Amino acid sequence: MTHQAPAAHPSASRQPSLPGPTGARAVQAALAFSLAALNLRIAVASLSPVLAEVEHDEHLSSFGAGALSTVPVVCFGAFAFLAPRLTRRFGPHHLLWYALLALAGGIVLRSVPGAPALFGGTLIAGVAIAVGNVLMPQLIKHDFAGRAGLMLGCYSLALSGGAALAAGLVVPLASATGWGWRPVLALWAVPALMAALAWLPELLAPDRRSANRRRPEPVQREGADTAAPGSLWRDRTAWAVTLYMGLQSLGYYAILSWLPTLLRDHGMSDGEAGWMLSFSSFPGMAASFAAPWLQQRLRRAFVPPLAASLLCATGFVGLLTSPVSGAYLWMTALGLGQGLAIGLALGYIVARSPDAHHTGRLSTMAQGIGYLIACLGPLGLGLLHSASGGWSLPVVVLLAVLVAQTVAAFGASRDRHVLASS
């Protein structure tokens, strides 16, 4: 049965609509958007292959290393709630540009010797990415409304591609140059600066300047939805989407932070372990790009999230039984499963919202609460590894999280809008 979306909410129609680019400028805008999205996982993915070296050189404990990996994810959640206020102040296009510049600065700062700079730079980068995370679905809705499915796929693809690029190159670059991890991590500020440069035409275009000067009105106004402001927080579908976002992100960031260390502990070299993390992103890129298409085409909406959970479970079981000998097989399964889950989680935010107004509200809730759940992944895995002295218990816990993720998918995949009366 095809879902008939309700008419656009009055509040949505009263929000200022940013003009969408056309022709050659539409291509330029799409490329600039994708380059910006590419940077939203680089800062996290570039750290994990050299986390052992960072831990040694900065004299961090296992808890400290886990905390360092957790800081960005905490920021993704905590500062997601700040993004709507900043958007009203600066406009979405200018705010993204500022976020990219802040991201570059944070990446450089974390490479300065000393734990304060390391954690401070990581914090700044995390705040910048948090703002970008919330802005991207909003920009898709405003600038690419006619191509939302395609741009959502490009967004998911760019996230996975950035992670693959950073995880795969950081160790070879450090080895080839002999610079060590600090200058090589600082190099990842260059893509952020390139993205900021590519985004400049979006700020300089006359229609963009006028659009960004028009600040959105407050959310609660005459004609807005009659439900109470906090009613979304009492909606089952909204919580299902939020929990699915949080639980799949927990597994993703746990693996992103600790997979190279796990494989090194089982005998892999630093370069091989970093490559395996990068390799897992390639099937993930394809799966995340296909996720919006699968959401729209498959009649049984629960099949894609179930497939994602089964693929992830295959990878986790492989890490328990033969992490090195079957590494390529397990990384393929894990990459496909996590890539599909990421694409589905982002897609649910759009699909379960009746209009742009609710998309913004659900995006803030799902990413804010979701990433606060996700921060338990890197920190929790580090603590479990320290407590147990091995990786079996942490991986078993990730399997248990998969069960909860699958349960959340039942509600998130239902063909129902948030705040629907029935």
Language model: regions and residue ranges:
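Helix-to-loop junctions at the C-terminal end of transmembrane segments
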Residues: F79-G91, A287-R300
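A late C-terminal transmembrane helix in Major Facilitator Superfamily
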Residues: A356-W391, L398
